[in-house]
Amino acid sequence: MSYSSDGAAIQNHSFAYARSPDQDASSPPHHPVVVVGAGPVGLSLAIDLAQRGQRVLLLDNDHRLSSGSRAICFAKRTLEIWDRLGVGDAMCAKGVEWNLGKVFFGDDLLYPFNLLPETGHQRPAFINLQQYYAEAYLALRAAELPLIETRWKNSVVSLQQDEPGAEGKVRLEIDTPEGPYPITASHVAACDGSRSPLRAMLGQESTGRVFRDRFLIADVRMQVELPTERWFWFDPPFHRNQSVLLHRQPDNVWRIDFQLGWDADPEEEKKPERIQPRVDAMMQQALGHAVPFELEWASVYTFACQRMQSFKHGRVCFAGDSAHGVSPFGARGANSGVQDAENLAWKLDLVLRGAAPLALLETYASEREFAADENILNSTRATDFITPKSEISRLFRDATLDLARNHPFARRLVNSGRLSVPTTLHGSSLNTADRDTFQGQMVPGSPVADGPVEVDGQPCWLLRQLPANGFSALIFDGPQTPALLAMIEIAAEGLVPLKPLVLSASGVAAERFDALPGTLYLLRPDQHVCARWRQASVVDVGAALRRALAVAA
């Protein structure tokens, strides 16, 4: 398998099981970090930790990547994270970029939309890319990093923890084709999916709301001349009283989601003879005629919006679908999981280095639980709008859609899936509250907006200039710059490395940060703002750094 492999080769690729020296050890070998699950979240976390210098053991109970397209819609923030992990270019080169979409009601186009209406961003709002490609590029990147050891066909079958404390360990028993063996770990990341065995081993569960509806996913390969846009239909003439979603993927594959209703038979609806007339009717509506197609993959699913009460239990942190689940409307599942991984990686790295206390890992749970609640709220609202549960709800929904034909205010009420955006971590204990007045979106807790900048006389992108492994300070150039550079070095002494980056106090970046000469922004390793000042002192920056590290003052 290589970066140039096609979809069939990737899906047919098997990773070889290999016996580990741990299986012959006289006592359980110890690992600083064990990541369980080699999906997009587990692979992203393992790569991030390894790039920070941490040795990672990655376990997966299978020996293949995902089959079928599954998650396909990867958001701008996920692409920016993957840029830092060394796979963003491969993802974007293969993926289908899109920013535009259309919403239909019955026979009519209600309105188009643009998810990236402003210029000055390196990455698009979204790419569509089959999950098996994303996993393949991440697996290839992981194989390039000597600090990652991946063990395929290694299943965690039991987990026990010592009592809480600085020297605590997690004890794991791993089953393989050659029998079980034990290991210990300082920290475990459970990225083992929605049916998480590790969650069950700890006696935990996800709670929330299960939706009584069924949807058919059909991936069809066909040659059609349609724009690269997200098309969503409410009550289309070819599928009355239901909804339909159409997306382009690479390799002339199209993702089509058909709402079926709760009474649909999942096994019957997956049959090609049931799918054929549905796709033919859709193409008749879109093109005026049916087209030949090949059914590549089909699945019928129900879904839930739910999460664990806490994402951290002792020395085990849960990330991705093991911690939270949402409906597919809005592409919030895999995207939020990759953001989980980024949030956890820098904190775990600093804890392992002794640069931050264990308390920093508690903020992984609190911040990502906050993000999960936001995603669940948006996903639930979208699902309620798309699948009204009563006649009154349907009447309200349809009246809103009617208004949206001609009235822009009503379009804000139409919800075909509020698409994934990164969470601004309002209220995080790692944020330093503003003392000065600022405008715009770059508040403490927000992810940094990319933009064109000039560094050392060369044009470049802001996010590409931020350090891969540490904190950074954005200084907007002015007479104070030399003093600020000296002050930053003093403030960070004895804490963590802090990289200064001097930017022009005019231009796109300065506008987005509402910057004046001398404005300073303190950024976390995951590229979130944690503090900002019009005039910063060494005491300000030192205190904000300690706060962002969860170090007691």
Roles of regions detected by a PLM:
Residues 70-141:
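Active-site-adjacent segment of FAD-dependent monooxygenases/related oxidoreductases
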Residues 10-12, 270-336, 356, 378, ...:
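FAD/FMN-dependent oxidoreductases across multiple families
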Residues 2-36, 51-52, 105-108, 136, ...:
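Helical substrate-recognition/capping region of FAD-dependent monooxygenase/halogenase enzymes
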Residues 109, 139-140, 187-303:
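Conserved FAD-binding catalytic core of PHBH/FMO-like flavoproteins
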Residues 42-43:
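N-terminal Rossmann-fold NAD(P) dinucleotide-binding loop
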Residues 29-31, 178-187:
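Core beta-strand elements of the Rossmann-like FAD/NAD(P) dinucleotide-binding domain
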Residues 50-70:
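Glycine-rich FAD pyrophosphate-binding loop
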Residues 152-170:
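A conserved short coil-to-beta-strand element within the FAD-binding core of flavoproteins
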